[in-house]
Swiss-Prot record:
Part of the 50S ribosomal subunit. Forms a cluster with proteins L14 and L19. InterPro entries: Ribosomal_uL3, Ribosomal_uL3_bac/org-type, Ribosomal_uL3_CS, Transl_B-barrel_sf. One of the primary rRNA binding proteins, it binds directly near the 3'-end of the 23S rRNA, where it nucleates assembly of the 50S subunit. Pfam families: Ribosomal_L3. Keywords: Ribonucleoprotein, Ribosomal protein, RNA-binding, rRNA-binding. One of its GO terms (molecular function) is structural constituent of ribosome. Residues 129-162 are annotated as: Disordered. It comes from Prochlorococcus marinus (strain MIT 9215). Belongs to the universal ribosomal protein uL3 family. It comes from the Bacteria. Gene3D superfamilies: 3.30.160.810, Translation factors (2.40.30.10). PANTHER family: 50S RIBOSOMAL PROTEIN L3, LARGE RIBOSOMAL SUBUNIT PROTEIN UL3C. This is Large ribosomal subunit protein uL3. Residues 142-153 have a biased composition (Low complexity).
Amino acid sequence: MSIGILGKKLGMSQLFDDKGNAVPVTLIEAGPCRVTQLKTNALDGYTAIQIGYGVSKEKHISKPEKGHLLKSGEELLKHLKEYRVEETSSYEIGNQITVKNFEVGQKVDISGKSMGRGFSGYQKRHGFSRGPMSHGSKNHRAPGSTGAGTTPGRIYPGKRMAGRYGGKQITTKGLLVLKIDDQKNLLVVKGSVPGKPGSIVNIKPNNVVGKKGGEKS
């Protein structure tokens, strides 16, 4: 099973298939990442691979983090991520994880922080229908009733209301890998990916119940 990789979203573009149809794609600079730690059952209670991505300035790294990162290489890394594995014997501290771990035609799950849209109303945040815009109506973009009076006499927790929209960690599943450029560390996937250009994303094999992760389907 292939472990995941960290990368940076570059933006969106389009490719054309054999029939001339435009296919929307997202370009991701995936890795290279460095293995910074191997976790084992004996020491940690579980087996996992920790990788790092993105060079950081020394002033932004604490002394404990600096000591931890220098064990695997000379560069100080900004982003760390763990992936559970069954065995760590095939990895060594300092190994490079690149886009070669993935294949064209493979499906992946990509996680990232969605674009923040600030405080938004009911229509924009939840897709509510608006009220009449004329004929004396004063209920244009108002929410309508939020709860009854005597019973229950309150608004239930989780009621969809206006509030901060976006800026949350979300995952888009089952994205198809269309192209890989290992010279430029580029991964081209079909469809959109969470976040804005320049944001960090986590790419891992598609997790399908009943199948091993990363299998072609």
